[in-house]
From Swiss-Prot:
GO terms for molecular function: rRNA binding; structural constituent of ribosome; transferase activity. Part of the 50S ribosomal subunit. Forms a bridge to the 30S subunit in the 70S ribosome. This is Large ribosomal subunit protein uL2. Residues 223-255 are annotated as: Disordered. GO terms for cellular component: large ribosomal subunit. It holds the Pfam family Ribosomal_L2. InterPro entries: NA-bd_OB-fold (IPR012340), Rib_uL2_dom2 (IPR014722), Ribosomal_uL2 (IPR002171), Ribosomal_uL2_bac/org-type (IPR005880), Ribosomal_uL2_C (IPR022669), Ribosomal_uL2_CS (IPR022671), Ribosomal_uL2_dom3 (IPR014726), Ribosomal_uL2_RNA-bd_dom (IPR022666). It comes from Mycoplasma capricolum subsp. capricolum (strain California kid / ATCC 27343 / NCTC 10154). HAMAP family: Ribosomal_uL2_B. Belongs to the universal ribosomal protein uL2 family. The keyword Cell division does not apply. GO terms for biological process: cytoplasmic translation. SUPFAM superfamilies: Nucleic acid-binding proteins (SSF50249), Translation proteins SH3-like domain (SSF50104).
Length: 281
């Protein structure tokens, strides 16, 4: 993977970088039609038109690619035919042609190449792109697209460059221990499936967007500080000039404490499966 740098021909180009897609992607053609569905823009609104997620809206129109997170096509080999861009995620995707004629998209893992064969099986070989139950994967292996519930589909480590490491297995064989990229160590049922390898496009976090307009293309709207708003818009607002917030601690637009408050529900059933909390940034 390579980062492409631009000359400072304009203010927006200064320090701007992009991913060199030509080094990885194999096609500029349209995606597989049978695996594409239309996607309507929600702009962070619910069915009543109220904002439920701030700073979203606009952006380029996209079509959704149906990704096989479940990898439930068992014991049937497939061949990677293309590596493609997906506007809905920061990872790339691969089109897999199975021997029975079916086609599916899976996440692109570091080291995948066109022509490679992949399979999801109980006793699949431990090589990049194959999917197997956690109980049959050796300790120390880097994984992605890990299930939290058997058969539900991968939920952990799906974004660009992410992976989890299998640290160990319980004596009774029911759970395995994983270390997440956040530093959290947790247990997962050994029957859950995971895919071998790290998600590709690992240099995505190094991209310098260069100008606000590129974020608008992605559907990200500006984030305005509360201290520059009016008092009817935010608890930090109001005052003459650059006034302090006038409170002991920063708060959200709805008056709740904003910093240092743990937001995870301690009564969650999965709380007992967390061996070590995630490390602070």
């Amino acid at each position: 993977m390579a980062i492409k740098k631009y000359k400072s021909t304009t203010n927006g180009r200064r320090n701007m970088t992009t991913i060199d897609y030509s080094a990885v992607l194999t096609t500029k053609n349209t995606p597989e039609k049978s695996l594409v569905v239309s996607k309507s823009s929600k702009a962070g609104r619910n069915n009543r038109g109220l904002i439920t997620t701030r700073h979203k809206g606009g952006g380029h129109k996209q079509k959704y690619r149906i990704i096989d997170f479940k990898r439930n096509k068992r014991d049937i080999f497939g061949t990677i035919s293309t590596i493609e861009y997906d506007p809905n995620r920061n990872a790339f995707i691969c089109l897999v042609n199975y021997v029975d004629g079916e086609k599916r998209y899976i996440l692109f893992a570091k080291g995948m190449q066109v022509g490679m064969k992949v399979v999801a099986s109980e006793n699949a070989d431990i090589k990049v792109g194959n999917s197997a139950p956690l109980k049959n994967i050796p300790e120390g292996t880097l994984l992605h697209n890990v299930e939290l519930k058997p058969g539900k589909g991968g939920q952990i480590a799906r974004s660009a460059g992410s992976s989890v490491q299998l640290l160990g297995k319980d004596d009774d064989g029911r759970y395995v221990t994983l270390r997440l990229s956040s530093g959290e160590v947790r247990k997962v049922l050994s029957e859950c499936y995971a895919t071998i390898g790290e998600v590709g496009n690992e240099e995505y976090n190094l991209v310098n967007w260069g100008k606000a307009g590129r974020n608008r293309w992605r559907g990200i709207r500006p984030t305005v500080r509360g201290s520059v708003m009016n008092p009817n818009d935010h608890p930090h607002g109001g005052g003459e000039g650059r006034a302090p917030i006038g409170r002991k601690s920063p708060v959200t637009p709805w008056g709740k404490k904003a910093l240092g408050v743990k937001t995870r529900n301690t009564k969650k059933a999965s709380e007992k499966l967390i061996v070590r909390k995630r490390s602070k940034k």
